[in-house]
Amino acid sequence: MDHHALNIQITIKLFAAYQDSYGVPELQREFPNQTTVKGVLDSLIHEHPELETWRDVTRFGVNFKFVEADTLLKDGDEVVLIPPVSGG
């Protein structure tokens, strides 16, 4: 069985606090098939616990559309995590 058939490659675009924590504007990651947008967020918060503050206020986009946290991802999707951004 092809190992990669069980995983999906996604691009994660980072903004504001997420970009500050990771120091890069985007990440390429592999996740198990059937991963949700929330699963991606959980993974990032696990790696950078200081992002927990933003868990409940982050909006999600997939391929330039706003989506709910339980949206299933497909191979090649582009996920955007958008925390509240103050003006200035």
Residue ranges with predicted function:
Residues 1-87:
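Ubiquitin-like/PB1-type beta-grasp interaction modules and other compact soluble beta-rich domains
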